[in-house]
Amino acid sequence: MDSQRNLLVIALLFVSFMIWQAWEQDKNPQPQAQQTTQTTTTAAGSAADQGVPASGQGKLISVKTDVLDLTINTRGGDVEQALLPAYPKELNSTQPFQLLETSPQFIYQAQSGLTGRDGPDNPANGPRPLYNVEKDAYVLAEGQNELQVPMTYTDAAGNTFTKTFVLKRGDYAVNVNYNVQNAGEKPLEISSFGQLKQSITLPPHLDTGSSNFALHTFRGAAYSTPDEKYEKYKFDTIADNENLNISSKGGWVAMLQQYFATAWIPHNDGTNNFYTANLGNGIVAIGYKSQPVLVQPGQTGAMNSTLWVGPEIQDKMAAVAPHLDLTVDYGWLWFISQPLFKLLKWIHSFVGNWGFSIIIITFIVRGIMYPLTKAQYTSMAKMRMLQPKIQAMRERLGDDKQRISQEMMALYKAEKVNPLGGCFPLLIQMPIFLALYYMLMGSVELRQAPFALWIHDLSAQDPYYILPILMGVTMFFIQKMSPTTVTDPMQQKIMTFMPVIFTVFFLWFPSGLVLYYIVSNLVTIIQQQLIYRGLEKRGLHSREKKKS
């Protein structure tokens, strides 16, 4: 086993990963066709069963803090639009990123209200409540840390329902508090609900990369319970009416996309019904409904929940609800990606640049792996030293493959050489490489993070393809500096074109990942020379015997 064969192993592993990724449906679920009829099969006992209608006509009010710009419909009190001023829509754009949207092309809303027998959002009791508000615009003032938006509704029986949105400075968690005053003579049976609904198919202005060669993160629904910390639920599964219907004490429901999330976190001592529903017209929903509570005559009842609407900032999300930070989807290598991100974030706290942080973490990773790298090159050198004996063995035994295999194994054992010793370090490096990819694609902190010169977004591909070309050049130098025993002309041609093939692959990769690979290759060149000097002293390597 030599260096060039190891490069072939990397290529095969890389291609296998690409095939596997394309096969893994939940990373990029296919959009469902728009439905023209209302689907009636929904989760039993859910708010959707109650038939919570669209918000209908109401007044739109504006609610602004330093990090949120919300539009709330007074008909039902749903959040119909959410802008994030701290996150530009695109690089160098003055327009904020829009997370929630209500338009003819796309629906993504955070609905909530009070259902149950006497709830104002129960269709049996009439249209959804039309709340009264004191003003049309609420703004968090300078020096103010909290903004409250009270909305009141009084039904025909004189019962008063108050829905208050509470927003805090610098916070993407919005508390939604309900206050029910029973003015009648009979108990009121009330349940609260929170629901996220979204169009399955993205419109062109939001579909920024479904046809690109690059891989994509999960877009869909998710939920958490004490028994299941984090479970994803694909939109197409909901569209097929394979709906969620479970009871949970605690937990949350959410909708996810790259870098951003919305989630409802109910706050009550009882159990909640978590459900999904196909609402028809190409729209799906995930939500919760609480157990009914009784508000006695002349008494006041309270219910509370929290809406997360914003970027997937792990430490802040973890403080809002247990396991909410798991919505940062690092894929099946999360156990590597999470520690890598924590280390990267710690380094960034000192250097202040994510690109330099990636360079430093590359040195750290390669430093930790140096003993394995040294063992790899030593094993390869020993294998090269055995080539004359192996060649003589092949000439002596001819076409007797079984005898050749047996004697080769005996030779390896006698010489204390592991024929797979050169592959093992590469197998260790591949998960780290892929984990770093998921970290770059899933961490909002790296979204639009600049490095230097022409690299203004480490999570996006190099616009001028300079980094992929540099990566190919470094791979070419590694290849030329590595001894080889390959004599087959076809294998030699494959190895010659390997840097070119990798360069083409890396054209669409995040520039931060390509930067990691360039630095890793440069470290490999340095380590290679240091190891070769040591092997020369042991008689296991000779520069004069190197073949191109």
Swiss-Prot record:
Q: Where in the cell is it found?
A: Cell inner membrane
Q: Which keywords annotate this record?
A: Cell inner membrane, Cell membrane, Chaperone, Membrane, Protein transport, Transmembrane, Transmembrane helix, Transport
Q: Does the keyword Transmembrane apply?
A: yes
Q: Which GO terms describe its cellular component?
A: plasma membrane
Q: What is the protein name for this chain?
A: Membrane protein insertase YidC
HAMAP family membership:
YidC_type1 (MF_01810)
Q: How does the entry describe its membrane topology?
A: Multi-pass membrane protein
Give GO BP annotations, semicolon-separated.
protein insertion into membrane; protein transport
Instruction: Give the CDD domains listed for this entry.
Output: 5TM_YidC_Alb3 (cd20070), EcYidC-like_peri (cd19961)
List the GO molecular function terms.
membrane insertase activity
The Low complexity compositionally biased stretches are 30-50
Q: What is the annotated quaternary arrangement, including any partners?
A: Interacts with the Sec translocase complex via SecD. Specifically interacts with transmembrane segments of nascent integral membrane proteins during membrane integration.
What does the sequence similarity comment in the record state about its family?
Belongs to the OXA1/ALB3/YidC family. Type 1 subfamily.
Its encoding gene is what? yidC
Name the job this protein performs: Required for the insertion and/or proper folding and/or complex formation of integral membrane proteins into the membrane. Involved in integration of membrane proteins that insert both dependently and independently of the Sec translocase complex, as well as at least some lipoproteins. Aids folding of multispanning membrane proteins.
